[in-house]
UniProtKB/Swiss-Prot annotation:
Keyword Protein transport: yes
Top-rank lineage group of the source organism: Bacteria
Primary localization: membrane
Family: Belongs to the TatB family.
Gene this protein is translated from: tatB
Subunit structure: The Tat system comprises two distinct complexes: a TatABC complex, containing multiple copies of TatA, TatB and TatC subunits, and a separate TatA complex, containing only TatA subunits. Substrates initially bind to the TatABC complex, which probably triggers association of the separate TatA complex to form the active translocon.
Keyword S-adenosyl-L-methionine: no
UniProt-annotated stretches for the region Disordered: 136-162
Protein name: Sec-independent protein translocase protein TatB
UniProt keyword terms in alphabetical order: Cell inner membrane, Cell membrane, Membrane, Protein transport, Translocation, Transmembrane, Transmembrane helix, Transport
Protein's membrane topology: Single-pass membrane protein
NCBIfam families listed in its UniProt record: tatB (TIGR01410)
Length: 162
């Protein structure tokens, strides 16, 4: 990198030992090595970023060339891929539109129910709630703890003895 040979490194080490002394030389070497590592990592990052920018620029140029050719002279595989992507995008757009329509229908149904509740008489609301409760009890049977048994266990034991 700097084209420094072994003899030049030893000369720098001896000068550093004379100038800094044996106590401060290791600290100075660690500090300099930290700087060297930082500079190397920065240089590596710059190289990677430049390489990415060059790749991106080449990709943009190839896209511009493809657009200039009007996609007519592309290979059949690329044409098929473009068509597949267009179909996928259209399908996603249709699914999104369907989801929006379902959301609108649900909002309309909620508004209708709220309007019916607002327009209903109190007796109709009570009657509707009672019907809902009867549907719930028909669908969900009551818990065993809440239902009193017809005969207790003691009575069953007495009947079994007789």
């Amino acid at each position: 990198m700097f084209d420094i040979g072994f003899s030049e490194l030893i000369l720098i080490f001896v000068v550093g030992l004379v100038v800094l002394g044996p106590q401060r030389l290791p600290v100075a070497i660690r500090t300099v090595m930290g700087w060297v590592r930082t500079i190397r990592s920065l240089a590596t990052n710059v190289q990677h970023e430049l390489a990415q920018e060059l790749k991106l620029q080449e990709l943009q140029e190839s896209i511009k060339k493809a657009e200039a050719m009007n996609l007519t002279t592309l290979s059949p595989e690329l044409t098929q891929t473009v068509e597949d992507l267009k179909q996928s995008a259209q399908k996603m757009q249709n699914d999104l539109n369907n989801a929006n329509q379902i959301g609108k229908l649900t909002d309309e149904q909620v508004a209708d129910i709220q309007q019916n509740i607002a327009n209903a008489q109190p007796s109709e609301i009570t009657e509707a709630n009672e019907l809902d409760e009867s549907k719930l009890t028909a669908y969900y049977p009551p818990d065993d703890d809440l239902v009193s048994p017809s005969t207790t266990k003691l009575e069953q034991d007495k009947q079994n003895v007789n």
